[in-house]
Amino acid sequence: MIRLEHVSKTFATKNGDVHAVRDVTLQIAEGEIFGIIGFSGAGKSTLVRCINLLERPQSGKVIVDGKDLLALDAAQLRETRKKIGMIFQHFNLMRSRTVAQNVAFPLHKSGLSKAQIKEKVSSLLALVGLSDKADVYP
């Protein structure tokens, strides 16, 4: 579960402050899949970066699985981030790897066994309707 309470993020620029995220409150239940859409420069990427604290909001609360991320120390935050997935706006697929191999790549550092990685990749591809593309190159 992800819950944001009155999250705001402002950037200071030479032309004044830019309010990238202003007083956002939302809740995403476990198992739900959300997309954030909007015009270029609307704050979509900044909002997502606030969820995993790649950007630290100036105000509000960021709660993931019942943990207030802003209250965690650096080590606790690193451990928590291992359980948070994010798809970047401009992501790069490795053309020399299949779709399944691209999905599996970050899992090799997670400590999972090969069998667990294969199972996880299979379930993730099924979740987004790409099981039939597992062995296709991008």
Stretch-by-stretch model annotation:
Residues D17, D73, A100, A126, ...:
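Signature (C-motif/LSGGQ) region and adjacent switch/coupling loops
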Residues K67-D68, A104, H108, K114-K133:
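Conserved ABC ATPase "signature" region
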Residues I37-F39:
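The feature captures the beta-strand-to-loop junction immediately N-terminal to the Walker
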